[in-house]
Swiss-Prot record:
It is a multi-pass membrane protein. It comes from the Bacteria. This is UPF0283 membrane protein HD_1769. The chain crosses the membrane at residues 57-77, 86-106, 204-224.
Length: 341
């Protein structure tokens, strides 16, 4: 056996070369958006009461209503038997007020159930639109779309949009395709109209705050206009809301607004001011007006997302940047042009 001698210089060391890794910024933004939506759902779920408390509250209200009616009837009987006609008049008034109050409670509960069904329909549509491998039939979704059309029948041009959507339907379409056609033919014109209303309201609020010197009057007027904006958006999407259901809608919208925060909006506005060379002469009132206008726009967009019967797809989701440029131009033309003159 021959002796083998190894020289370190002859030994070749293989280096493992890894391929270059590239990161796409668009993918990062999508992940951030997904995380934000997930967190919004978590916060919204945290603010939603459990079914146990809801059923308990319903049972208490039912018992209270029965007790009030029984007491009213007892007062009527006692007044008639005792020939106390003044007490009888008060008993009749109390009985009528009790019936009106119970009827109002039942009506408000009905609108809360309606809002819950609206949320369930939106959640189902969101799951169907996000599922890329969905191959189920679209007949069930056709029924859902007809239910939505029943709520929208009072709006103009809905009949034409309904005929256009039905003419494009095919039995071979799956659930996702049916929802896409319904969104394109029926809801997209409504989306355009709602965006115009949001942009107009945000611009007017910004100008009001930028020009008006009365802070308290501004706050009251902006609050009233924002409430009117949400009510107008809900009516355009065919939502019928009661007092409690409207409060619940406001709660959901404001909860998501608070979570999202205003830091990203402030950054975007700062970039626009730098690009348009407005930082040298921007005033405090103009900045406050722009901030109020952007908050109004965000409130309208969030209300739009909650009131729309079918959830937005990723490319359809409205963005505040669509309104921001129009808002800045309006404030510049109305406020800075006035100062220069």
């Amino acid at each position: 056996m021959k002796k083998q001698i190894f020289n370190e210089e002859n030994v070749s060391i293989e280096k493992k070369i890894e391929p270059k890794q590239e990161f796409d910024a668009t993918k990062v933004s999508v992940e951030d958006e997904t995380e934000q939506l997930t967190a919004e759902l978590i916060i919204e779920k945290g603010f939603t009461p459990s079914r146990f408390w809801i059923r308990g509250l319903l049972a208490v209200l039912v018992l209270f209503g029965l007790a009030v009616i029984a007491r009213s009837v007892q007062c009527l009987i006692d007044s008639v038997q005792a020939h106390q006609w003044i007490d009888l008049a008060f008993a009749i008034v109390f009985f009528m007020v009790s019936l009106a109050g119970i009827g109002a409670i039942i009506r408000e509960w009905y609108w809360l159930v309606y809002l819950r069904k609206h949320q369930d329909t939106q959640h189902i549509s969101k799951q169907l639109l996000m599922d890329e491998l969905l191959v189920t039939s679209g007949q069930d979704n056709v029924v859902i779309c007809h239910q939505i059309l029943a709520d929208l029948k009072s709006l103009p041009h809905i009949a034409v949009a309904k005929q256009r959507w039905q003419s494009q339907l095919n039995e071979a379409y799956n659930a996702k395709e049916v929802l896409y056609l319904f969104s394109e033919n029926v809801l997209k014109p409504l989306d355009t109209q709602v965006k115009q209303i949001i942009a107009k309201s945000a611009t007017e609020n910004a100008i009001i705050v930028a020009v008006s010197p009365l802070v308290i009057v501004d706050m009251l007027m902006i609050a009233w206009r924002n409430i009117a904006l949400v009510n107008k958006i809900s009516r355009l999407y065919g939502m019928r809301l009661g007092y409690l259901s409207r409060l619940k809608l406001f709660k959901m919208v404001l909860t998501n607004m608070v979570f999202a925060g205003a830091t990203e909006m402030a950054t975007d506005v700062g970039m626009d001011f730098f690009s348009q060379n407005l930082t040298a002469k921007v005033s405090l009132r103009a900045a406050q007006g722009i901030g109020v206008g952007l908050l109004t726009a965000r409130l309208g967009i969030k209300a739009m997302e909650f009131c729309r019967p079918i959830a937005f797809q990723k490319e359809e989701r409205p963005k505040i940047s669509e309104i921001r440029q129009q808002l800045l131009i309006a404030v510049k033309n109305r406020f800075f042009a006035k100062n220069e003159a």
